[in-house]
Amino acid sequence: MVKESDILVVGGGHAGIEASLIAAKMGAKTHLITMLIDTIGLASCNPAIGGLGKGHLTKEVDVLGGAMGIITDNSGLQYRVLNASKGPAVRGTRAQIDMDTYRIFARNLVLNTPNLSVSQEMTESLIIENDEVVGVTTNINNTYRAKKVIITTGTFLKGVVHIGEHQNQNGRFGENASNSLALNLRELGFKVERLKTGTCPRVAGKSINFEGLEEHFGDTNPPYFSYKTKNFNPTQLSCFITYTNPTTHQIIRDNFHRAPLFSGQIEGIGPRYCPSIEDKINRFSEKERHQLFLEPQTIHKSEYYINGLSTSLPLDVQEETIHSIKGLENALITRYGYAIEYDFIQPTELTHTLETKKIKGLYLAGQINGTTGYEEAAAQGLMAGINAVLALKNQAPFILKRNEAYIGVLIDDLVTKGTNEPYRMFTSRAEYRLLLREDNTLFRLGEHAYHLGLMEKDFYKELKKDKQEIQENLKRLKECVLTPSKEVLKRLSELDENPINDKINGVDLLARDSFSLEKMRSFFSFLAPLSERVLEQIKIECKYNIYIEKQHENIAKMDSMLKVSIPKDFVFKGIPGLSLEAVEKLEKFRPKSLFEASEISGITPANLDVLHLYIHLRKNS
């Protein structure tokens, strides 16, 4: 049977959900093919969304019309702001989720969305005509023709599950791997490599002894992810903290020879920032204990996820290991930990739209691009979906810059640098992180969302008004010069604020940590009518004013630099500071400007600085 659609999405994980929903929302006739409809939106690993850097991604996805934020706000069990004591740039919202509620909400959203159809089958191969994808074939002899295809296969491409010496061809424990499609992608000439990730054991809640364990509460004023969420009053369940101990470590050390990670059984590289417990004990042998979090998987608390105990050790070793841990002495293991090895395609094979360079109309998103994490997958799925629709309409692509969004950092890192290990987002990856805070996501991306047709006009008008109020009042505060007059000193004293000794403008005064929103309203009467959302932005902009201005200067400098032309006869070879790889790529592609050079995978900002310097020296010589 032959079926037709505008856009075809392969895979119903977190990338596939966002890709299919956004494509349908933007008016494209979309079809999603997934192996199991019941596992759409399944959280295969930890039952949580958000975190450091990841919370930023989730909120950006939400503002740009994505679903992850609203699904999380409707399925969370505990909400916290991580790094709450630090500056706003590095804070991250995180939620424990009810895995069942999240999955059901996501599945129903997909099934009930207009313009979007779903079928349960396995994609086996791509149909390519004149280096352009035109559809796929499936395991039940269906043929789907489409103008654009987005592949979001997660860990299913030639997936192999490892538990001790036992191996099985699975894309997730108990589910078939996608071997035919994996072979097809290799045959098409993509640069395919292997990665590895793992998951932690789960134990029955009734078998845990919580007495003596440290209880970990949610925030009193719980944060939420979606700007559309109203009247937020979620259930807040506790997590619990326990630790490994020297006995635990010795059990694991005694079985290193049986660990697939060390025996040579696993060849793929695992996530650097989420190592297995056997890897942690091997690498940090001096540590006497490692922290573990017991996290409820659902509101029923029937199963708990042991966060921090990712492992692929044999079953008997997992049993012995878990029973050596305080609170888990009599724990009943409901699901064992395992490692999974899978194919991914080097993301340098992609453009910034996530379309492959090799095959027109083919987009890749999620773990197939070498990333790890639900949020990273969702962000890529969203961007692939948006750009597939824009290409369908012959409109300009939507590419976020590194100074606009963490999504921009994520995609730029992937397509220009590639990766040899599972890539996850951190705030430290963003050089402009003071500008890319969670709290200003709406102000950063609202205009983009509106022009893409992904934000309602009335809300955008309100947002635009808020943005204007922020800019106008910051300008007014900068122009407002205060002197240590009797009146000013008296008003400061009444607010329990330290006196000023010299002239100071309003921005510098509000940079004080002690100057609360209430004090701002009281001291500067023109701020009194402003909403809390606007006041918070003004406060943050005042506090980090010097650094924010510096980052804006750096952006302007970079934008100016990228406009610099490269002479036709410019010789790249022999320039100190350029690696052999950079020279080879520059000689091969002969970019006409530094902007074109910046688009070449493997060319770093440091390379661009060196080129800029030597172009300048040549012009002046």
Swiss-Prot record:
Annotated FAD binding sites: G11, G12, G13, H14, A15, G16
The keyword Flavoprotein belongs to this UniProt entry's keyword annotation: yes
GO molecular function terms listed in the Swiss-Prot or TrEMBL record: flavin adenine dinucleotide binding
A single GO BP: tRNA wobble uridine modification
UniProt GO cellular component terms: cytosol
Pfam families named among the record's database cross-references: GIDA, GIDA_C_1st, SAM_GIDA_C
Binding positions for NAD(+) per the UniProt entry: 270-284
Gene3D superfamilies: FAD/NAD(P)-binding domain (3.50.50.60), GidA associated domain, C-terminal subdomain (1.10.150.570), tRNA uridine 5-carboxymethylaminomethyl modification enzyme MnmG/GidA (1.10.10.1800)
NCBIfam families documented for this protein: mnmG_gidA
Family: Belongs to the MnmG family.
Quaternary structure and interacting proteins, as annotated: Homodimer. Heterotetramer of two MnmE and two MnmG subunits.
Function (record text): NAD-binding protein involved in the addition of a carboxymethylaminomethyl (cmnm) group at the wobble position (U34) of certain tRNAs, forming tRNA-cmnm(5)s(2)U34.
Name of protein: tRNA uridine 5-carboxymethylaminomethyl modification enzyme MnmG
Source organism: Helicobacter acinonychis (strain Sheeba)
Classification of source organism: Bacteria, Pseudomonadati, Campylobacterota, Epsilonproteobacteria, Campylobacterales
